[in-house]
Every structure is written in C-alpha cells, then in structure tokens.
C-alpha cells in the first residue's frame, strides 16, 4: 500500500479496523504504530495525526455504518434478518435435500413490513444482510489478475451489520473507503472471492469502485502460507533476531514484485521512486530466510562504521565483560562478517576467555599447517612478540611478516597457528594481527603459551 501510494504521489492512510470484537487483540494498535515507526513508513493521515476524513478508528464511526445499511434497505438492496443462532445452526447441519448448508435461505427476505416493524418494536435481535442478485454475473477488474467474472447465483446474502450493532469487515471497509476517497484498495489475493460483493455494494450506492490490487500470497513453502499461528516469524520476531528493519522492508518489497533491472538492494526512498504496479506478479512468493539473511548481511556491510558501532554497542557490551578491550576495533572486525546482529555474542565470546579447544584446529589444508608446523611457528613467534615494546597492529604485522621471511615459510603457516591460539575457534572475526592488537600483549602471550603447551601434550 505504501509504495503504491508514494509511487503515484498519493497519500498513505492509517485506519484502525477494530469492528470485529471477537478478534480484538489488546495492544495491537501499539504494535502497528511501532512497526510503522521502525520501518520508516510514514502515514499521511491517521488516528494519531488526524486528517480531513477522520475519525480513523472504525469503532469511533459506529453511527455512520448503520445509516448506510438502512439506506440500502430503503433501496431494496438489503434486509433485516431475525433468524436465531439455533435456526442458522440447524440450517448449516443440512437443508431439505440433505446437502451441506452453503448459503442463507433468505427466510427473512419475505417478511412483511408489519412483521419487520413488530420484531423491531419488540427489541428482537437482528442483522442486516445484503440482498444479492440471483441472476446474471458480476465483473470487476483487478490490476494484477485482470477481469474476473462470477455468477451472481453463487453469492451469499452476506451480513452487513451484526447483531451487536457493529458492521462486518467488508461493509465497514466499503463505506470508509468511499468516504475517505480511497483510490486503490490493496490486499491479499485470498480476498478476490469477496470482491464481487464489494462491487455490488458500490453499485447499490451508485458509487465508483476503487482500483483493486490483489497481491499474491507469501508462502512458507510450495504448499503452505506464512502463518504466525504455525510458528512463522512476525516483523517483531525478525527484529528481535537481529535483522535490520530496512533490510526486512527491502526484502518484503521484492516478494511478488520485480524491479525493471536486476537490482536487489534498495533504500526506502529508492523503492518509492522505482516501484511500479506493472511489476507485480500473480504467482505466490516463498519467504526465503536464507535470502533475507544474506540481504541483511549486505545491509550491515554497507553501513558506515560509526552507525554500525552505535547499532552493535549494546550487544557488544552484553557479550564482552572485559571493559579494557576496544569495542570499536572489535565492531570493525565484525561488520564485514555478520549476517544478523544476533551473531555478535557467538562471534566474540572468545575475547573474554579462551575456550577449551582441540589441537585439530591447528591443522588446515589450505594454510598447509599441521600440529608439528603449528608448534614450531608458535615457539618462533613467542619471543618475537615478547620483545615487541610498542604493541600496535602495525608493529605486530611487521614483526610476524618479518618472521615469516626469516623462517622461509608460507604466511598461513605462521598466521593460522597464531590466530588459532589467540581465539581457540575454527573461525574468528579478524586474523592474527587484529586479534593480538585487541587482546593486548599480556593476554596474547598467555594464549600463545597455552597453545604451545596443548600442542606439546599431543606430540
């Protein structure tokens, strides 16, 4: 909705649709506000900022819906229904032919005006149903799916106003979309089947229908739609798992929409400028967590270092208790290696304390190292580093590279053992020089000595 509005110089309106009291969720409105704020999707009108067509909370517009429902009754396009729940339940069980109930049988359509008034005067509960045509067809146009035609005989006399005085979702939306001058109605393709009823409501009032844009479903896999009830992640879940809001927005924008080129990374501003309805697809999209994770990693890599540090600082402080370590240096190492912010604790825990590790880590085919080579390299590196008076990354680099030349070995045959001894991990953010610089001289020498001892014990 947001991109369609902005790409056509329109307004993006926030309307709280809370007329279904059975599905009302406490705190849901706050989640909507928080999500819009985090994603940068700024609405032009809404409950919090007002606008020309308020109020923007449907439960505050209750008087409006009943008036329009009664107008339809007067026009002959709707009617009162006094059927009890027991009668409707019995109807659902079977009809006269023993078939499963699929449509209301219009029992109350034939009530006389006197009977209707008598029931109303007696305070009998009622709903208001839309009177559907029983012959002919209804056709509507959808931007994505084209012209769709249904047989009117298949349409049920849907409820417009419920017995509790609240409008149904379908009816309230038609009324509010018209009154708020909504030009584009954007929703999931599962609502295609109810759109003929919308179209007939617009026709009954003599209003122009909006432009319909039905979007394909987002799937967990080839057979199942995404569903929070089945454990699929919400936006809040993704953020709590270390995904960036802008990366999630970017990825979701690409589900069911293809840009004119092969570009995959867009800022919100770029999406607003290049989005085009013509790029929407009919085919369902599969929510690929691996693709989102890759995209998130690209966003992290492309951030400026200061912005990344601000983002990562709290996680670094929670993960690393040693306050003498330079967290900014650690952040610089991490930035090019992270996929999500929640990877941080796992990647930095060795800075606090050296984990227990196997000497198998010293064996690396590509680096051409064995346990014997690793032991020899660490023994050679120890005195060189001990004699280093000015402990900086540059000086550590020069000292170790000079030692490589002296020993006549490959770079990796020295640097891999030193890196392994310093981290105790199969992989680490940063190599031997960076880790030694951050850990400091005393801790680095201590860990190298532990590495030597471990190797001596197995050789």
Language-model features: locations:
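Short histidine-centered catalytic/ligand-binding loop motif
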Residues: 184-188, 237, 384
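Glycine- and acidic
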Residues: 13-18, 179-185, 233, 399-401, ...
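Helix-rich, typically C-terminal accessory recognition domains appended to large enzymatic cores
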Residues: 392-439, 443, 452
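Active-site cores that bind ATP or allylic diphosphates and position pyrophosphate for catalysis
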Residues: 71-74, 79-214, 220-226, 259
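Residue-level signal for inorganic ion chemistry
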Residues: 1, 32, 72, 76, ...
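Long, amphipathic alpha-helical coiled-coil segments characteristic
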Residues: 365-400
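Catalytic adenosine-cofactor/nucleotide-binding cores of aminoacyl-tRNA synthetases and other
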Residues: 205-359, 364, 368, 423-459
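N-terminal Rossmann-like or analogous alpha/beta NTP/dinucleotide-binding catalytic cores
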Residues: 1-97, 195-207
């Amino acid at each position: 909705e947001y991109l369609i509005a902005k790409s056509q110089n329109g307004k993006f309106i926030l309307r709280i649709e809370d007329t279904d009291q059975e599905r009302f969720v406490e705190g849901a409105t706050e989640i909507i506000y928080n999500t819009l704020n985090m994603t940068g999707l700024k609405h032009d009108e809404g409950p919090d900022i007002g606008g020309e067509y308020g109020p923007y909370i449907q439960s505050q517009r209750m008087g409006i819906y009943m008036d329009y429902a009664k107008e339809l009754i007067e026009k002959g396009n709707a009617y009162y229904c006094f059927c009890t729940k027991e009668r409707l339940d019995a109807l659902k069980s079977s009809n006269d032919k023993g078939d499963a109930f699929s449509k209301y049988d219009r029992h109350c359509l034939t009530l006389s005006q006197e009977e209707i008034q008598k029931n109303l005067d007696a305070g009998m509960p009622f709903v208001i149903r839309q009177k559907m045509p029983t012959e002919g067809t209804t056709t509507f146009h959808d931007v994505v799916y084209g012209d769709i035609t249904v047989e009117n005989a298949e349409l049920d006399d849907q409820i417009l106003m419920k017995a509790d005085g609240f409008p149904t979702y379908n009816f309230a939306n038609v009324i509010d979309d018209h009154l708020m001058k909504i030009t584009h109605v954007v929703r999931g393709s599962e609502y295609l089947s109810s759109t003929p009823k919308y179209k007939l409501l617009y026709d009954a009032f003599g209003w122009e229908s909006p432009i319909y844009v039905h979007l394909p479903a987002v799937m967990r896999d080839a057979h199942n739609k995404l569903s929070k009830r089945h454990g699929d992640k919400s936006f809040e879940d993704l953020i709590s798992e270390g995904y960036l809001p802008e990366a999630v927005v970017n990825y979701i924008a690409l589900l069911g929409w293809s840009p004119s080129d092969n570009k995959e990374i867009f800022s919100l501003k770029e999406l607003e400028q290049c989005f085009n309805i013509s790029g929407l697809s009919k085919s369902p999209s599969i929510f690929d967590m691996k693709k989102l994770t890759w995209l998130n990693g690209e966003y992290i890599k492309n951030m400026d270092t200061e912005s990344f540090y601000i983002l990562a600082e709290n996680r670094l402080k929670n993960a690393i208790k040693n306050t003498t370590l330079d967290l900014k240096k650690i952040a610089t190492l991490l930035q090019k290696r992270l996929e999500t912010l929640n990877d941080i604790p796992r990647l930095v825990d060795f800075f606090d304390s050296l984990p227990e590790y196997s000497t198998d880590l010293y064996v690396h085919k590509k680096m051409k190292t064995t346990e014997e080579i690793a032991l020899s390299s660490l023994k050679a590196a120890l005195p060189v580093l001990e004699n280093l008076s000015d402990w900086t990354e540059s000086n550590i680099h020069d000292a170790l590279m000079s030692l490589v030349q002296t020993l006549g070995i490959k770079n990796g045959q020295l640097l891999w053992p030193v890196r392994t001894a310093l981290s105790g991990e199969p992989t680490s953010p940063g190599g031997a020089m960076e880790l030694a610089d951050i850990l400091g001289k005393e801790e680095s020498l201590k860990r190298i000595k532990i590495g030597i001892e471990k190797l001596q014990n197995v050789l």
